[in-house]
Amino acid sequence: MRVLVLGSGVIGTTSAWYLRQAGFEVTVIDRQPGPALETSFANAGQLSFGYTSPWAAPGVPKKAIGWLFEKHAPLAIKPGMDLAQYRWLWQMLRNCTHERYAINKARMVRMSEYSRDCLNELRAQIGIEFEGRDLGTTQLFRTQQQLDASAQDIEILAQYGVPYEVLDRAGIIQAEPALAHVDGLVGALRLPRDQTGDCQLFTRRLAQMCVDAGVEFRFDQDITGLVSDGERITGVHVNGTLETADRFVVALGSYSPALVAPLGMRLPVYPLKGYSLTLPITDPAMAPTSTILDESYKVAVTRFDDRIRVGGMAEVAGFDLSLSQRRRETLELVVSDLYPKGGDLSRAQFWTGLRPATPDGTPVIGATPFRNLYLNTGHGTLGWTMACGSGRYLADLMSARQPQISTEGLDVFRYGQYGHAPQHENRTCVLPAR
């Protein structure tokens, strides 16, 4: 049975791997010249299995108003003429209640913890290396209010059996010795089972392993639309040619909604623009041990072999990929405060990418109203974290095997009207430029 996977980021590539392992004939199609050249290219590098939280959280609407006037705000909204932007923001606001936050976080933790197990199993099986570290995540709190607010997160972590530690200043320094000079840290939440790693390196190496296993990758291919007969997808237009298969997987990140919209599906995935800096380490003793998350700025500082990756922030600004000097200054501010002697900022590489976010934070994985069309998208800032679990979960669904975790709330049908039957048949679409 032939499957076309549309997209060669970390989500598309892990999907291809697990589908091939399940016995499918797999072809991956992408318009880039190679794998992991967009959102997966230079993300923060966190494998945040325990630190998994939706942006839609209690208190965020009030904070967002204040952030409008802050230079280094973690969230920025740039209103435009895009109705999808306003629809997505409204849905996000509706998820900023304690009840919805608990439901959404529980779903995300379920997938993230499963993904940790899948990644560990994959590493043991095929020995893939990606500058990974298994030394945990430390979430830094600069105010007592931030520390107190972590109580709800801790409750959900305990519910799912996720190990954690609440650290005082001495505990922070023990976990991350280079932070001994930093003043004003009131505490931290440490998640010892979290990991780090270079997402692009992982994806490139897994893609090669996919090829060795019989997966075909076709790059520099423009995907311009799906064609259906009302019940099934009959093909996808690629470089002006109709490509056919038995099943189709859409793993195009923020560009997924444009592909399925002409089929009558309104997929609530919107790009959250993020930024990163990658700088060479100058003094290993003054660099991070693993991953630090600065709660005030929502910025992560991650250690690779000989590099530091600083990433974070979220801009609701459509498909704009321009680089913002202000955002660079925020990243430089955080790494200079925490690790002033750890790396060389003068040699830093600045990058931006679009994370495909849902308003509730949970990805969209699984079946659609079309019997042979599947989605694997909407992971937001956690695509790297959830990639292996999402790929394995999808392969199990498509193989009619019982997934190892609950399927509750993971597919598009949780949005009600967004899972309705298609209104138009045999239509195509044109994706936004990227």
Curated annotation (Swiss-Prot):
Keyword tRNA-binding tagged: no
SUPFAM superfamilies according to UniProt: FAD-linked reductases, C-terminal domain (SSF54373), FAD/NAD(P)-binding domain (SSF51905)
Enzyme class: oxidoreductase
Alphabetical GO biological process terms: D-alanine catabolic process
GO cellular component: cytoplasm; plasma membrane
Functional pathway: Amino-acid degradation; D-alanine degradation; NH(3) and pyruvate from D-alanine: step 1/1
Co-factor(s): FAD
Pfam families: DAO
Stored InterPro entries: DadA (IPR023080), FAD-dep_OxRdtase (IPR006076), FAD/NAD-bd_sf (IPR036188)
Keyword field: FAD, Flavoprotein, Oxidoreductase
GO molecular function: D-amino-acid dehydrogenase activity
Catalytic activity: a D-alpha-amino acid + A + H2O = a 2-oxocarboxylate + AH2 + NH4(+)
Residues that coordinate or bind FAD: 3-17
Enzyme Commission code(s) on record: 1.4.99.-
UniProt record similarity statement: Belongs to the DadA oxidoreductase family.
Known role: Oxidative deamination of D-amino acids.
UniProt-recorded name of the protein: D-amino acid dehydrogenase
Organism: Stenotrophomonas maltophilia (strain R551-3)
